[in-house]
């Protein structure tokens, strides 16, 4: 039980730090669609798609690595709660168009990036 817990903790710590750094560096550039939040959600989609495809292709790999990457890294890095707060903030400010654009960009983009992750693994390996 300790190895899976450590895997999630290590991945989660790395993911949280990545998310924080990107938010600090990028989100002020464009407050209507904060690029740091968008980037972590899109990259997280790509990583989780590629990881699941990789582990399906190579099932003999220690499952703790999958936990580290999917539950830990992607769980710590991606952020539905911050995305939700940003959309609500846009709605409260009357920026309805940007709220809709944000929802469509995050959801559609993340789904497409997850598909791309699966596709990349099948293409390259």
UniProtKB/Swiss-Prot annotation:
It is a multi-pass membrane protein. GO terms for biological process: cellular detoxification of fluoride. InterPro entries: FluC. Pfam families: CRCB. The chain crosses the membrane at residues 4-24, 36-56, 68-88, 100-120. The keyword Lipid metabolism does not apply. GO terms for molecular function: fluoride channel activity; metal ion binding. Belongs to the fluoride channel Fluc/FEX (TC 1.A.43) family. This is Fluoride-specific ion channel FluC.
